[in-house]
Structure formats: C-alpha cells, structure tokens
C-alpha cells in the first residue's frame, strides 16, 4: 500500500526483474526469488517462477480470444499440450470464465479482462504471483470471489502473492502482512508489519478502520464482521439521529442535460444495451453500477459517440449527440475513459497542460492548477508515460475539467487513486454539482458512490433494473453497500463523515 505514485508498481517490477532490465535505472542491493537473483536473471528467465498482472491487463494481451490468451503463457514455457488443456479447463472454472472462453478479447469489459489476465498467469503455476490493483475493475462480488480463490491457493498450495492495492477495504481481510511504501518526506522508504499495526499508524485507511479509530474500538477492526461485534453502542446512539438528506428530489426538477431514449448497443451480435431510457438533470451526480459486463461502459461511450448506437437517441442539452462536433462538444461534455492513458500524447506533464489550455481556450495555467488540486506533488517535467496509472488518470481528469464542461462522464475514475487523491476528486465533483454542472460515473467503487452520488442507476445484462436515491439503492444491496452501511445496519448510514457530523451536532 502507499499513496499514488509512491512506487508500489515499481516495487513489483523490481521483484520480477522488469526493473532494471526493461526500464533501465541503477539497481543497488539484491533481490532473490526462490534462490534466483533478479540482477542475474532477466524476466523471461523468471517466467516459470514469477507471474505478474499489471494495472492495465489488456496491454499485455497478445492473442485474439480468451482461451488462446489463457493458454499462451504455457505455450511459451513449452508445457505439453495435454497438460495445457487440463490447466485451461481448471482455470476457466476456477475464475468463472467458462462462458467467455470463445469471446474476442476486444469485446471484454475491464473487469472481465482483469480476470482473464489473472487466469493466464495462474495456468503457468508460478510460485510467486504479483498483482497490481487486481480488483480495480472488478465489481464487489467478483472482487470477493477472486480474492477468496487467491487466498485458497495461498493456503492450499503455498503460493506467495504480493498485491499492490488502493482499495484496502477489499483486501485487508485476506492479507498476512502489509508493506507500506511511504511518500512525501519519507519517499522511497517502507514500513512492514501486521495489518493492525500498519493500519493503526496509517493516515490512509478504509472506512471500517476510520470508524474504529474514532470510536477507540479495541482491537482495531479490519473487517465489517469485526466492527459489527463492537458497534452495538454506536448503533444505539445513532438510532434517533438521521443522516443528511441529499438534494436528489429538487435536482430532478431542473432542466435535463442528458436524455437517452430507447438506446440499443450491439457488439458482434451481442446486445450490450437493451432499450434503455435514462435522464440526467443539471447538478446531478449519477453513479452507474452493476456487475462486470453489465453494459456500463457501453452506456457511457454511446453518449459521446465512441460506442456505435444500433437504435435509439442520445440528446445532450437538447441536441442530438451525433450532430455535436469540436468545440461545441468539448464545452458541453467531458469524457474520461477507463483507459485514460490513450488521451495523452505530449512529451511532458506541463506540455499536456499547456496544450489543454490552448484547446479549451482557457487562461494559461488553468489545467496545471486543477492537476495540482488532485496531485499536489506531481513533477511538471515528467513524461506522461513515466507516471503511475493513478497519476495519468489525474492528468487526464485535469485536462477534461479545464474546459469546464456542463456534463462530465467518468469510467472507473478512482483506478490508481489513493484515499487522499480520491477525497480531492470527491471535493471537485461536489463543487461541480454545486455549480449546476452534472456528473455521470460508472464505477465499482461503492465508497466513492456513497460519498458523492445523488442517484444510482443499476444495470444488469444491458437493462436498467434499478434507479433511485443513493441511500435507497446502496443500503438495500448486500453486495454493493458501503462498509459503514453494513456495520450500522439496519440504520441508514452511508459514510464515516455522516457519522461524525451527526454525533458532533448532537
């Protein structure tokens, strides 16, 4: 764990030899894995021992279909064909991918691609598995399943797994130790300890830990189950209090910024969106949620013309979306896709910001100022490709926000962001909503939704199955409820900040 850009991904790449063999740089000290020195062995010579899944799994795909990709690594290692077939079948079943075996990799959702990448590494039977944000694109149910499977492999087979992760609320219950990569004035240093020891000292922590510290619970809970055992006095204290009411009802009476009517989207004869009707008013923050492959990214892509529409209509501020081009489109809608890196092309952070100011026709320095709000310590001379995934996401967010669009569309906007960066993003999104601008975001980050959304739309297999207030939708969903809701159920609470505010006022 560690803040955005602290070096977590670099640490993983050190372990499998990508640093310095592929990235360059000067390596001092020694790293050995099962007796092999990463200094003396190149990554290909460690491939039978170490498997790695990066932050953007799709970048590592080399074949066309799911089954071919899962088998490819074994082919490279010369695994006999009969053994390959057996391992492929076992892994498809293990990770729930059997129904996707013949799917083209280009048609997978972000979460499906993440599971395929993990499967492709597992079939090679490594002794050490390195995972860089393995649940960032997974829905809560899929994340729980994948992490449970990995934990079982650790306990049953002795597999060693090292995970770099920002969403600690998902992984704390599974880990034996934490390596905290420190930032700021202690940059480059690490602190290693048991989960409770590290969480007790860390400023960044999931809601369950923040609540435990605030209530001085002993022992400090790391899971919802542990917290519920300690929370009865707090539940009694909150029984006669109410969380603040979000302005969803009065917002709905404001003019519409986005209208989607009878929308149908189809890929390779697979219907991704099935006749959805959907509206967004000025000042709304709407979260699109659902399982992996439910159609969230397809819905967002259709609003800006990235996803071809088979039938139906998309209106932006009353205008057909397909008729809007250039500056009129940029000033109206800003879009940050799941793979935000695709939007970066300049040689430095400062150059990206300068180009964005020019393209958006705003005062020079506007984009960099927004970027500094999200990431105060970013280096302006750094090449965008040298940034971490979270830093690149913040750069793209700043570029899009500089144009001050009336509607901001975000696809998984917290991938790679630590808790501090996420809080800064939440502050910006709330500010936009207060100014009457609108936000639509597709995400599996239930804690983000609990903090910022005024409304939640739930998709399943391309259909809208629920549409209501954030409080109503999240507290009624066992799988998608945030940690505070689970701890304090049946009380209707969403966030730690709601609890502290209510207690301070009473």
Where are these regions (language model features)?
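A short, surface-exposed alpha-helical micro-motif characterized by mixed small hydrophobic
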Residues: 171-173, 449-451
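Conserved ABC ATPase signature
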Residues: 104-108, 112, 383-387
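Conserved ABC ATPase "signature" region
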Residues: 82-100, 362-380
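H-loop/switch region of ABC-family ATPase nucleotide-binding domains
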Residues: 165-166, 443-444
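Catalytic Walker B motif of ABC-type/P-loop ATPase nucleotide-binding domains
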Residues: 129-132, 408-411
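ABC ATPase nucleotide-binding domains
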Residues: 199-256, 480-506
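Helix-to-loop junction immediately C-terminal to a conserved catalytic motif
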Residues: 16, 304
């Amino acid at each position: 764990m560690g803040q955005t850009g602290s070096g977590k991904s670099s640490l993983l790449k050190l372990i499998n030899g990508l640093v310095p063999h592929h990235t360059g740089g000067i390596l001092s000290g020694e790293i050995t894995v099962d007796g092999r020195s990463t200094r003396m062995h190149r990554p290909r010579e460690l491939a039978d021992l170490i498997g790695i899944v990066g932050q953007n799994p799709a970048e590592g795909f080399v074949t066309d279909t799911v089954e071919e990709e899962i088998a490819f690594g074994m082919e490279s290692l010369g695994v006999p064909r009969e053994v390959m077939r057996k391992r492929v079948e076992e892994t498809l079943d293990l990770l729930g991918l059997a129904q996707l075996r013949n799917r083209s990799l280009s048609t997978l959702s972000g979460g499906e691609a993440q599971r395929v990448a993990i499967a492709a590494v597992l079939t090679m039977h490594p002794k050490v598995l390195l995972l860089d944000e393995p649940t960032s694109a997974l829905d809560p149910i899929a994340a729980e399943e994948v992490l449970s499977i990995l934990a079982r492999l650790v306990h049953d087979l002795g597999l060693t797994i090292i995970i770099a992760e920002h969403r600690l609320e998902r992984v704390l219950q599974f880990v034996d130790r934490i390596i905290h990569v420190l930032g700021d004035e202690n940059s480059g240093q690490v602190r290693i300890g048991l989960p409770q020891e590290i969480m007790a000292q860390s400023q960044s922590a999931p809601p369950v830990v923040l609540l435990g510290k605030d209530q001085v619970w002993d022992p400090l809970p790391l899971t919802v189950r542990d917290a519920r055992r300690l929370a009865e006095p707090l539940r009694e204290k909150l029984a006669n209090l109410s969380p603040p009411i979000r302005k969803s009802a009065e917002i709905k009476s404001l003019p519409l910024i986005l209208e989607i009517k009878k929308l149908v989207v189809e890929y390779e004869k697979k219907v991704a969106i099935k006749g959805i009707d959907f509206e967004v008013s000025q000042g709304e923050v709407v979260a699109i949620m659902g399982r992996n492959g439910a159609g969230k990214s397809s819905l967002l892509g259709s609003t800006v013309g990235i996803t071809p529409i088979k039938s139906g209509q998309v209106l932006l501020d009353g205008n057909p979306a397909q008729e809007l081009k250039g500056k009129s489109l940029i000033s109206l809608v800003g879009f940050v896709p799941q793979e935000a890196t695709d939007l970066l092309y300049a040689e430095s952070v400062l150059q990206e910001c300068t180009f964005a100011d020019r393209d958006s026709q705003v005062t020079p320095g506007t984009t960099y100022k927004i970027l500094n709000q999200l990431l105060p310590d970013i280096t302006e001379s750094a090449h965008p490709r040298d940034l971490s995934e979270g830093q690149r996401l913040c750069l793209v967010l700043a570029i899009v926000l500089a144009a001050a669009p009336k509607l901001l569309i975000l696809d998984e906007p917290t991938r790679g962001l630590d808790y501090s960066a996420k809080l800064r993003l939440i502050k910006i999104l709330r500010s936009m909503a207060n100014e009457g601008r609108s936000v639509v975001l597709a995400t599996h980050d239930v804690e983000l939704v609990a903090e910022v959304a005024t409304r939640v739309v739930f998709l399943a297999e391309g259909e809208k199955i629920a549409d209501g207030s954030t409080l109503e939708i999240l507290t009624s969903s066992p799988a998608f409820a945030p940690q505070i809701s689970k701890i304090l159920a049946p009380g209707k609470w969403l966030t730690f900040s709601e609890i502290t505010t209510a207690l301070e006022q009473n």
